[in-house]
């Protein structure tokens, strides 16, 4: 099973409500469907990494990609609910930001859930009922601070990459910072940028 891809985006396309990219990786081109905000964030002829969920059927193989691991994992939770397929899962993530969606599921905010295309009241009720307990820990702290389940802005990662840091070490630094409660001098992107650079520089040989 494919769980992660890193490669150059060769082509971007929209077919109806589907946001598609062609990723060149190891001499192979992979068609991957993204949520709209991720599709807007990527550019052709640039290297990106995607967390992948693979769906295999008798006559088809589909890849769904996410820039953030937390969103890929939430997508997997969503499509485990009876009656919720991959397109409905993507619609939910398109309609709501990650934390807003988790909060809506935990608090049974049916109005928010029904904003997603193709999600009616009964499906929203079933989603909230089945996922509430599993996702409660994700919103245990609802303060303004970031927590490790919040997706980090792609532009922060991109900025660090332009400074010469590798993606894997950036994500490791972000995870370590989350475990430390975040930067000590603020919670804006500049604070996270400074803290990541300091942390990664201190671990250089």
UniProtKB/Swiss-Prot annotation:
Residues 147-155 are annotated as: Flexible linker. This is Holliday junction branch migration complex subunit RuvA. Residues 68-146 are annotated as: Domain II. Coiled coil: none annotated. It is found in: Cytoplasm. It comes from Parasynechococcus marenigrum (strain WH8102). Its main location: cytoplasm. One of its GO terms (cellular component) is cytoplasm. Keywords: Cytoplasm, DNA damage, DNA recombination, DNA repair, DNA-binding. It comes from the Bacteria. InterPro entries: DNA_helicase_Holl-junc_RuvA_I, Hlx-hairpin-Hlx_DNA-bd_motif, NA-bd_OB-fold, RuvA, RuvA_2-like, RuvA_C.
């Amino acid at each position: 099973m494919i769980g992660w891809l890193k490669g150059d985006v060769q082509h971007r396309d929209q077919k109806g409500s589907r946001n598609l990219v062609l990723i060149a990786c190891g001499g192979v081109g992979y068609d991957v469907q993204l949520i709209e905000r991720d599709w807007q964030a990527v550019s052709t002829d640039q290297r990106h990494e995607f967390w992948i969920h693979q769906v295999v059927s008798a006559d088809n193989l589909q890849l769904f990609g996410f820039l953030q691991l937390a969103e890929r994992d939430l997508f997997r939770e969503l499509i485990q609910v009876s009656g919720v397929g991959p397109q409905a899962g993507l619609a939910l993530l398109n309609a709501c930001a990650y934390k807003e969606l988790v909060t809506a599921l935990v608090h049974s905010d049916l109005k928010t859930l029904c904003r997603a295309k193709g999600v009616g009241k009964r499906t929203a009720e079933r989603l909230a009922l089945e996922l509430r307990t599993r996702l409660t820990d994700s919103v245990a702290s609802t303060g303004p601070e970031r927590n490790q389940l919040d997706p980090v802005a792609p532009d922060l990662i991109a900025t660090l990459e332009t400074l010469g840091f590798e993606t894997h070490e950036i994500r490791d630094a972000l995870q370590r910072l989350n475990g430390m409660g975040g930067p000590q001098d603020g919670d804006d992107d500049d604070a996270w940028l400074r803290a990541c650079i300091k942390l990664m520089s201190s671990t250089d040989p």
